């Protein structure tokens, strides 16, 4: 029987597959998803983690015997038993069929439809309408298959049911209102049957089905839509092409979108930004090498090594420190959705990574939370106005320039960069943090 540790971030639907499978098989799976044991975006980028899981992705599973495996479907398969995998060659093939179908056919339209309602992806009306029709087709396909069946393969729950249910989960919770889903009674019956099994409930809790289809918040995210009068930037700059190959490789590594969240469709959409000239080219050279600090921060102890290095080398004339706070805390509900706001902002600022560093923290609990952070920017002004590509999210935050020499700034930098401290100015407990680097 498998036993080990699952590394993930909170409320990761991909991790649910393995956790539900373990409930059926009896596999002993410990979950590390929050500080201090696992800092998503930090722990999974350390050399030790990457030696075990080269892709840096989560979920990732480390067995008590040292066996390591990543990719959610592979982990779910590993912690399953023979009944879940398919007890005959034919059944096993059908299980793989539905697992593959979930990834190839369900995930893309589900992401296109659901992600904008969660605030983690740009909204495109035509793409959303196409996604709705594709979801309708998929539900109809499932409905026909389940007309004479209780489960997708055989007479018992298998990995096929677990995988497809988890892939459909946010559709049912976020957008499949009664009028939309009523045309698929067999699919609904099967979905409800599965989520009410004790093994599913132990992981998912009580799943509340959507009552009213969630919509894209046009007022809040209108600025994410392309502006017709905004000219396209040039695809590259002479300075960029003339840089040494080693430096270009280092920048590419620093600027690459984090792969570990596995939200492929969302990441592809958010990363598809046009290349632009360097908005910081006009600034004089600085003695502070941000990449070197980032290496210290990633590979050394924050309090004893990285922070002393930061203050010893920080160039207050060439760089500036800023405190940010989300303007609309009353709109923050589920903590995982609040974290998605941070992740989405980081993805949209991908090209700013070479000239910025930040630690942004979610404080509090569901329906009582706040978001704030400390940022390091090249130059003395906020970087966002320098490029239209960076102006999507920053107006949703208040910004206050910090005095590098003040005791308040020293405390803020120490607490936010280390994720440790009293955070007395916040009034809520640390929940989780994300690093922009």
Swiss-Prot record:
Stretches with biased composition (Basic and acidic residues): 221-254
Keywords: Acetylation, Elongation factor, Isopeptide bond, Protein biosynthesis, Ubl conjugation
Residues recorded with modification N6-acetyllysine: 147, 212, 401, 434
Residues annotated with N-acetylalanine modification: 2
Keyword Acetylation set for record: yes
Cellular component, GO, one term: cytoplasm
Pfam annotation, one family: EF1G
InterPro entries noted in UniProt: EF-GSTs, EF1B_G_C, EF1B_G_C_sf, Glutathione-S-Trfase_C-like, Glutathione-S-Trfase_C_sf, Glutathione_S-Trfase, Glutathione_S-Trfase_N, GST_C
Domain GST N-terminal: 2-87
GO terms, molecular function: translation elongation factor activity
Keyword Protein biosynthesis: yes
GST C-terminal domain ranges (all copies): 88-216
Residues annotated as domain EF-1-gamma C-terminal: 276-437
Glycyl lysine isopeptide (Lys-Gly) (interchain with G-Cter in SUMO1) crosslink residues: 253
Membrane-spanning parts: none
Cross-link for Glycyl lysine isopeptide (Lys-Gly) (interchain with G-Cter in SUMO2), residue positions: 285
Modified residues (N6-malonyllysine): 434
Ranges for region Disordered: 221-268
Its biological purpose: Probably plays a role in anchoring the complex to other cellular components.
Subunit record text: EF-1 is composed of four subunits: alpha, beta, delta, and gamma.
Protein name listed in UniProt: Elongation factor 1-gamma
Taxon lineage: Eukaryota, Metazoa, Chordata, Craniata, Vertebrata
Primary gene name: EEF1G
